[in-house]
Amino acid sequence: MHGLKKVWRHRANTKFGIGTCTLSGLAIAIALIGGATTAASAEDDVSIYFVGCAAPTGFHGYLARGAEEAGKNLGIKVNYIYPDQLTIPNQIQKIEEAMAAQANGIAVCAFADDAAYADVAARAKEAGIAFGSAAAPPPGSRVRDPNDIFLFRAGSDEGAAGKLSAQRLLEMGVRGRVVVANQQPGDSSCQLRATSEIDALKAAGVTADFLEMSMDPGQQAETLSSYLRRNPDTVAATSTCDVIDGFLTAKADSGRDDLILTGYDITAQSLKAIGDGRQAFTIDQQQFWRGYMPVLLLTHYLKYGLVEGNYFLTGPTTVDKTNVGKVQALVSKGYR
């Protein structure tokens, strides 16, 4: 059977709880590699492993769904595997499992700096396995570096995402203090979002503070509420790395109906909050594409010797009150 083989390590609820926003008109340049030797010819069966960051539920369910759709459309076998707990050693172990299974191609949901993957990428290349990243390209990059350890990168430009968030706040007339929080300090993408937003706000003369949080919504609410008491001039707060629940609770408990909340990625909670006005907008990376495009790019490389000439940017885009209805309509279908 073609499609996605889910490799479970624990019981998980497979109901999709989030989605992505309307696809933007991004383009990709494809170049033919002259004389390239690949692990499969156009007539061979192709086996691709997608090494995820987590179980195929919630946010990561959309990456898995994208990989599944690509497998069905291309007629290839896609195996989705993931570590029980997301650490660099655990994810490397899963990559090694895919290599041991003689995968033709591997796409990894890279969450750490390139240095963490350099050794396993070199070993995959030596074994003749195509190795790509289902994550953001280097900040500001467009054209692929020929010396890149990854065959391709398919993800959102997180530096641009932070700047977009700041731009939207400035367009809303924000002039007071803004707090930007990262709930997962070890995640380089979330930190880049936060840093880029803060830098852009400060460049425009707006006071912007960084706040480190945990992934626990209750602790997030307590931390933000305490910050708001210390800084009553705060006019906006951004959640860069988790669902918006803790921020919504802090807004309600503090009686700050005027507090502008913004976030990243899409959850049912954020869509509802955007619809009723409690949240202004969310920055979306369109993670369905982060699952679909790596499978397509690996398949086309393995069968036809094609490699992307530029990095494929899945975002950033914005979901706000003007388009939230369209996004919600596709959430239950697993595409948004």
Residue ranges and their predicted role:
Residues 89-104, 220-233:
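Short, well-structured alpha-helical segments in soluble
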